Amino acid sequence: MPVQGSQRRLLGSLNSTPTATPHLGLAANQTGARCREVSIPDGLFLSLGLVSLVENVLVVTAIAKNRNLHSPMYCFICCLALSDLLVSGSNMLETAVTLLLEAGALVARAAVVQQLDNVIDVITCSSMLSSLCFLGAIAVDRYISIFYALRYHSIVTLPRAQRAIAAIWVASVLCSTLFIAYYDHAAVLLCLVVFFLAMLVLMAVLYVHMLARACQHAQGIARLHKRQRLAHQGFGLKGAATLTILLGIFFLCWGPFFLHLTLIVLCPQHPTCSCIFKNFNLFLALIICNAIIDPLIYAFRSQELRRTLKEVLLCSW
């Protein structure tokens, strides 16, 4: 796949269009000091990937070990951790191979390197897509548990969850394979952007509706106990803050990458867009940061999972 400068080969095709390449130098001259590339050292990439790898391995291990966590909700959380694990692991592998090749410690034919690059691209793309899907699945699961509490266990059964998980993985692999094969088509990039926006809207609508229901419930309790009105106000502020953090982190970590894809379609030759293209590695680093944050939001808040994790860590010593 074509790449530019020091940028990683992994997903490098997203940041190189034949028509835009001659304009990169022009962008630097026209925008001057404003056109800056945020350099991401390889050591930082490896460190972020390692932290994410350890976190998500612990989540998967804890859920696999404790049978009490073999519910649909934790199955989705486990698959999210596995997706984030693959995102981090593939980036670490790509960075390590690149460093070894540049240092001359690893010798391989160009065809072999190209095949390895394509495999890593497919793994990374499929894990990104599956990660977004499982974030949406977790939101849907929580929504059903709140609005259809009495019927939850008949609606969200383990077999249905397993079928949904299998469908997500298969669809992610197939879509990522097509994406790698036709990465230079604008329609492919637009499909990815639309998919991201759909997941963002889905999560925002569901979580806002859940927050409204929780505030309504707290308000009803406050009416019965007038002294608890201040507590109700505090609950509303806390819920709004939690929702803002959850959606804010999702948008901050994933948004720049999909903005990058959008600009490739809309303005591949514009100097300002070319400046944004130079920060492709930063956008990948933000996605890895999201893989670090996901366990803190969705997994480690569970008391049962933390207890199991503590047992796993104690047994390993």
Curated annotation (Swiss-Prot):
Cell location: Cell membrane
GO CC terms in record: cytoplasm; plasma membrane
Chief location: membrane
Glycosylation sites: N29
Lipid attachment residues per UniProt (S-palmitoyl cysteine): C315
Keywords per UniProt: Cell membrane, G-protein coupled receptor, Glycoprotein, Lipoprotein, Membrane, Palmitate, Receptor, Transducer, Transmembrane, Transmembrane helix
Tissue: Expressed in the adrenal gland.
Superkingdom of the organism of origin: Eukaryota
UniProt keyword annotation of Methyltransferase present: no
Database matches in Pfam families: 7tm_1
One Gene Ontology molecular-function label: melanocyte-stimulating hormone receptor activity
Bilayer-crossing regions: 38-63, 73-93, 119-140, 164-183, 192-211, 241-266, 280-300
Ranges facing Cytoplasmic side: 64-72, 141-163, 212-240, 301-317
GO biological process: adenylate cyclase-activating G protein-coupled receptor signaling pathway; regulation of metabolic process
Membrane topology designation: Multi-pass membrane protein
Segments on the Extracellular side according to the record's topology features: 1-37, 94-118, 184-191, 267-279
SUPFAM superfamilies on file: Family A G protein-coupled receptor-like
Oligomeric form and interacting partners: Interacts with MGRN1, but does not undergo MGRN1-mediated ubiquitination; this interaction competes with GNAS-binding and thus inhibits agonist-induced cAMP production. Interacts with OPN3; the interaction results in a decrease in MC1R-mediated cAMP signaling and ultimately a decrease in melanin production in melanocytes.
Stated family: Belongs to the G-protein coupled receptor 1 family.
Biological role stated in the UniProt entry: Receptor for MSH (alpha, beta and gamma) and ACTH. The activity of this receptor is mediated by G proteins which activate adenylate cyclase. Mediates melanogenesis, the production of eumelanin (black/brown) and phaeomelanin (red/yellow), via regulation of cAMP signaling in melanocytes.
Name the UniProt record assigns to this protein: Melanocyte-stimulating hormone receptor
Native organism: Macaca mulatta (Rhesus macaque)
